[in-house]
Amino acid sequence: MSLLQLTASITKAAADLDDATNNAAKASEIESKAKTALLDAAERLVLAYRSPRQWLIDLSFQHCATASLQMIMKYRLHHAVPKQGSRSFAEIAEIITTPDQPGKLPESLVGRLLQHAMSFGLFTPAASGRVAHNDASLLLVTDPDLEAWVYLCSNVAYPAGAQLPKAIEQYGASSEPSETAYSVSIGRRISQFERFREPDGHAEHEMFARAMKGISAGGAYDVGHVVDGGYPWHELPEGTLVVDVGGGPGHVAIALARKYPQLLFEVQDLVETVEFGAKNCPKDLQHRVSFRAQDFFKPQPQRETDSRTIVYFARFILHDWSDKYAGQIVEPLAQAMRPQDRLILNEVVVPEPSVEQRIERKSHDRDLLMLMNLNGRERTLVAFEGLFEVVSPRLRVEKVHKPTTGGELSLITASVDKLTGRKSAGGDIFGANVDEA
């Protein structure tokens, strides 16, 4: 794009944001699209007028921000800064300790770390040698779930990423969750989820559970995009049973149950997870939201005599797994499905090149994150179709719905029937509100 085209895109997006305030019915949809366009155009503008040499040099320094964040999270520097007012680097150095490493960082190092963080927008400078919270850093104190996500990314995923070349040298392009950069980083041939289930891994498991809540509350992964993003849940027949596969403590099912009273829900997950979910399910929904201990690699309960429509819903599950294991998760669902049933996957659909650059990059960021930690992957629509083809020639994608409220997870609806032909990604498989790109 030329400079004039980019500035025109920014001007139009800004105007659309103003218009959103005058259109209450479609405000969230207009605002989401306008913000995406504005951020994408702004990033393209910066990229277009930075020399290739300088761009490469800047790119090579990006790991420094994560290294700084790693230290901040490990030593809990954000908790040493008061919610209101400011504190000196010397005072912070006196406060901070970690449970596994008592002791203090020198004032000079605390200052260097916080000054670096302030340079990329985390914290804000006060008087000389003092620091205060800004909106972003304060969230690390007030939102423990988001704090857990940032900690895991900086102190678990970041060290794993550094071991990716060694993991490839050692294991090749493995499909096994125990042969990952993460396993190399901890010096053990064990999967991340297996590690979490070990007695001394429970703290990390709890942190992971909080992190999943943190990334699902607000922003791109908010559950509200599933509930209020325009997917036609209201068109499902009265009494439809929605089976939330790997549904954790049931937060998505509970949110859907509140909005759509004609639907029933069954949350499936590991024993300890569903026990927790059942205990914490709101009393007024307990007659419509049930919990079942179920390994998603195992066959589904027999429901041939059940006349209800059954929707198998899996959110953020398949991306944790390589194609080998993702197929093993989908297969029992496909075997259980009848022509009136549906499978809905709430997953990232990696866009084709040349769409909004920000969206494309974030999709590939997540793809590498899955590779490093689990040997999982994010998938294009063609990859989902290929996975279904391997599992069952009767399983086909019907529609891909992109929430009108924004968000980065699509809802992929699939069904089984007697048809042997399959729609391609270039057909009318996307909903009317979705660009094919």
Curated annotation (Swiss-Prot):
Pfam families: Methyltransf_2
Domain of life where this protein originates: Eukaryota
Active site (UniProt): 319 (proton acceptor)
Cross-referenced PROSITE patterns: SAM_OMT_II
Sequence positions that bind S-adenosyl-L-methionine: 269
GO terms, biological process: methylation; secondary metabolite biosynthetic process
Pathway(s) this gene product operates in, as recorded in its UniProt entry: Secondary metabolite biosynthesis
EC number(s) stated in the UniProt entry for this protein: 2.1.1.-
Cystine pairings recorded for this chain: none
Keywords: Methyltransferase, S-adenosyl-L-methionine, Transferase
Residues passing through the membrane, by range: none
Induction / repression: Expression is up-regulated during the late stage of P.nodorum wheat leaf infection and is controlled by the cluster specific transporter elcR.
Entry-linked PANTHER family: O-METHYLTRANSFERASE ELCB, PUTATIVE (AFU_ORTHOLOGUE AFUA_4G14580)-RELATED
Family under the similarity heading: Belongs to the class I-like SAM-binding methyltransferase superfamily. Cation-independent O-methyltransferase family. COMT subfamily.
Name of the protein in question: O-methyltransferase elcB
Taxon lineage: Eukaryota, Fungi, Dikarya, Ascomycota, Pezizomycotina
Gene that encodes it: elcD
